[in-house]
From Swiss-Prot:
InterPro entries listed in its UniProt record: Ets1_N_flank, Ets_dom, ETS_fam, Pointed_dom, SAM/pointed_sf, Transform_prot_C-ets, Transform_prot_C-ets-2, WH-like_DNA-bd_sf
Species this protein is from: Xenopus laevis (African clawed frog)
Name of the encoding gene: ets2-a
Residue ranges: DNA binding: 366-446
Gene Ontology cellular-component terms listed: nucleus
Main location: nucleus
Protein name according to UniProt: Protein c-ets-2-A
């Protein structure tokens, strides 16, 4: 062999892959214990040689590294706060629509309004509202499992959490001790109640009750001696036994119940058939819930008493609730209610005490319209507020004095007529009180006070010695 050939061999040898291939195959043989897997070992070795590096060789294949990260306390807090903010959206609606904070005492209308809000808030489709044609007591008595079976998919847990939170919140309030007055301003500010000036009056909620003997359920439940405070402040309806709640019928006559149910059924049928889509607002940032509020009010305003029940109140429990919820009796007027209690109007006392009226209507704390009726039926107040002699029309002769007394009743020393008038304006849309056009400080009750109170305007005028007002 020539020198040229030897040099040529030296040049070619380094690129000859035969020996390396033999080592690869030998490696395959050494790694295979079963003769039948000869070719599979060869192919695996070949694939190993041809493998393209991916940069993932150092990545751990431990199963624990593939799990989703657990929720940290921080992320849980963020989610909880987000839900809480969403729930607060309903709280604002509840105050505006006059829905009680205690879901145990909701009627069918309140339950529907809550579900309607949830459907819009969570963009729920094809919600069968007929499944929830029940009052608040029935709703809260379902329990979580039965509730989830009726609720829409995916959001049942959230809705139940919201309902449960409202129940717990009210239960905690009912068990709270006396609340320091210094906390009232911050609470009222959070609830944005200053615009309506329906605020907590701890003194009034626990007012002296010498003049009104307590009989019935509340006397047994509370066992409060005469002359002591009946209930603690910042306290609304408590969770009473189901027997008392189911018999709660003083607020509605059978006819109005049937009418409300028939209207609600018609509304639910329209909702389920998609006929209310025209009511939805197409403008961004405008909630369609508000666009249907007029429709909801059209069938909740069939009874003036129902309307009065819807007026929001941010105070505590009414002074007298002994007969407001014990109600195996047929619906009656306030006049019959007083006579049934053997409490005739005392000389020098208002014919319609606001505390007893609040207990009769079941509205909870004393509301502005009830307070005005108390002043109007008290002869000693005729110097600053009185009937004009024209039906249910009345005049604030001294509006500042009326505002001052309302502020004293509600523990709001800074109350003035401007703030009081904002509360009065709220009643306009509810068809409870209207402003008389062309007359200053003159208003008129436009709801059905005759059926509610059992008195005609002329009867009250005669009892109070009211003469027709000829000044204007």
């Amino acid at each position: 062999m020539t020198e040229f050939g030897i040099r040529n061999m030296d040049q070619v040898a380094p690129v000859y892959n035969g020996h390396r291939a033999m080592l690869k195959r030998q490696l395959a043989f050494d790694n295979v214990s079963v003769p039948t897997s000869l070719y599979s070992g060869l192919f695996s070795a070949y694939e190993e040689e041809q493998a393209v590096p991916t940069g993932l060789d150092s990545y751990s294949h431990d199963s624990s590294s593939c799990e989703l990260p657990l929720l940290t306390p921080c992320s849980k807090a963020v989610m909880s706060q987000a839900l809480k903010n969403t729930f607060n959206g309903f709280a604002k609606k509840r105050f505006r629509l006059g829905i009680l904070s205690n879901p145990w005492l909701w009627d069918e209308n309140n339950v529907f309004q809550w579900l309607w809000w949830a459907a819009k808030e969570f963009s729920l489709q094809n919600v069968n509202f007929q499944k929830f044609l029940m009052n608040g007591h029935e709703l809260c008595s379902l329990g979580k499992e039965r509730f989830l079976a009726l609720a829409p998919d995916f959001v049942g847990d959230i809705l139940w959490e919201h309902l449960e939170e409202m129940m717990k919140e009210h239960q905690e309030k009912a068990q709270e001790p006396y609340i320091d007055h210094s906390n009232q301003d911050s609470i009222n500010h959070w609830m944005n109640a200053d615009s309506l000036n329906f605020t907590t009056d701890p003194l009034q909620c626990g007012a002296q009750v010498h003049n009104y003997p307590k009989n019935g359920m509340f006397n047994d439940m509370c066992s409060v001696p005469t002359g002591q405070t009946l209930l603690q402040p910042k306290q609304e309806f408590q969770q009473y036994p189901s027997s008392c709640l189911k018999s709660r019928a003083v607020n509605y006559s059978p006819a109005s119940q049937d009418f409300a149910r028939s209207n609600m059924n018609a509304l639910l049928n329209s909702l389920n058939s998609g006929k209310l889509r025209d009511y939805d607002s197409g403008d961004s940032g405008t909630e369609s819930f508000e666009s249907t509020e007029s429709l909801l009010q059209s069938w909740t305003s069939q009874s003036s008493l129902v309307d009065m029940q819807r007026v929001p109140s941010y105070d505590g429990f009414e002074e007298d609730g002994s007969q407001a919820l014990c109600l195996n009796k047929p619906p009656m007027s306030f006049k019959d209610y007083i006579q049934d209690r053997c409490e005739p109007a005392e000389l020098g006392k208002p014919v319609i005490p606001a505390s007893i009226l609040a207990g009769f209507t079941g509205s909870g704390p004393i509301q502005l319209w009830q307070f005005l009726l108390e002043l109007l039926t008290d002869k000693s107040c005729q110097s600053f507020i009185s009937w004009t002699g024209d039906g249910w029309e009345f005049k604030l002769t001294d509006p500042d004095e009326v505002a001052r007394r309302w502020g004293k009743r509600k523990n709001k020393p800074k109350m003035n007529y401007e703030k009081l008038s904002r509360g009065l304006r709220y009643y306009y849309d509810k068809n409870i009180i209207h402003k008389t056009s062309g007359k200053r400080y003159v208003y008129r009750f436009v709801c059905d006070l005759h059926n509610l109170l059992g008195y005609t305007p002329d009867e009250l005028h005669a009892m109070l010695g009211v003469q027709p007002d000829t000044d204007e």
